[in-house]
Amino acid sequence: MLFKSFALTLLFAAARVQAASNCSSGPYNISAQGTLDELNSCTVLNGDLYISDAGNSGITTLTVNGIESVQGDVVVSDGQYLTSLSFPSLKNVSGAFNVNNMIRMNNLATPELTSVGSLNLAVLPNLQELQFNAGLSDSDSVVIDDTQLQAIDGISLDSVTTFQVTNNRYIQEITMEGLESAQNIQISANSKGVSVNFSKLSNVTTATFDGISNVFIGNLKSAAGNLYFSNTTLDNISVPYLTEIGQSFAVLYSPELTSLNFPNLTTVGGGFVINDTGLTSIDGFPVISEIGGGLVLLGNFSSIDMPDLSDVKGALTVETKATNFTCPWSNDDSVIKGDDFTCQGSVATISATSSYDLSSTVSATSGSATSATGSATTTSYSSDSSASSSSSSSHESSAASNGFTAGALVLGSLLVAALAM
């Protein structure tokens, strides 16, 4: 009897040693529930966890039991049949949490997950709901691309490097009420009626808002890079506390827009572009004094009111269809420093030529000649919003997995389109 008890003790100890070994010998490649079950005793998994169905096993449901922490990446990809994946105990992932190319997945349960190194959800065309029940409060990057989500629920961050929501055709609301600081924000190619709320956002590097119906960034004070609005159904854009934009500013193809309100904006380090047919007056910038690149204003406006503007380092292109327009600047004054000067009304078709290429604009402080004179590129302009099409990034997961790289391509295409029409 004593020997039997001793043998059982040894067996139990051996099992614990084996379990500990299983938990620290990653990476782990999983394609079946049985393989996952071998990790049930692991509370902490050391190494990357890869879950895929590349072998077309036909498995439809997987549950990752027991694991509370992964010291590495979690990558779930390329499953043709997997519809449901559950991490009932998972609380944190030190690396990336990536789920992509799962065309049938309609359930992704992560009820305890609060912290990841980065979050990437891409090409999940049947995923309708996020289940971050405990609240995802820590992630350096969030990329959500090509899903059927209607809202971004359960994500509450106060700072983030990249926040990208693209190609989600059913999404109606993107709300990040606690977000105060971000390096790169890209909202584009989603549902036409999407509403965006970043009510506490005070600092951003670059932000693109494309195809939105409502936006609240009323507390934004600093934009160190670019700030773009395009293809929107907004009737008003108001950013009352913003004082400086480090690089370029653009408002494009938003025909319902009737007013702009930037009462404290003094400086734009790069190009300044407005191409909209709904504005009857270019105003709302009462204290802007310096534009580090070119100034491009296209549309149906009858007046321009920028009373403090004294220094435009690049070229000027102003064209409007209004017949009662009077240009507030002349080629002889000292405001426009660039070589090209176009400022005219009664234009039947907005189609001018300029040597200024906004896509090459950089901050005036960089010392580049581009910011002062523009590049030697011939471009033309059009104020017809119908000529523009919304820039949509690829539905391939590679675009989303590259984070803001895809966003940069979208921004570039928008700017090139604005200047090439």
Swiss-Prot record:
Entry function: Involved in the negative feedback regulation of pmk1 cell integrity signaling and is linked to cellular calcium signaling.
Protein name per its UniProtKB record: Cell wall protein ecm33
Membrane protein topology class: Lipid-anchor; GPI-anchor
Sequence similarity: Belongs to the SPS2 family.
Gene Ontology cellular component annotations, sorted alphabetically: cell surface; external side of plasma membrane; extracellular region; fungal-type cell wall
Glycan attachment points: 22, 29, 92, 197, 203, 231, 236, 264, 275, 300, 324
Sorted UniProt keywords: Cell membrane, Cell wall, Cell wall biogenesis/degradation, Glycoprotein, GPI-anchor, Lipoprotein, Membrane, Secreted, Signal, Transmembrane, Transmembrane helix
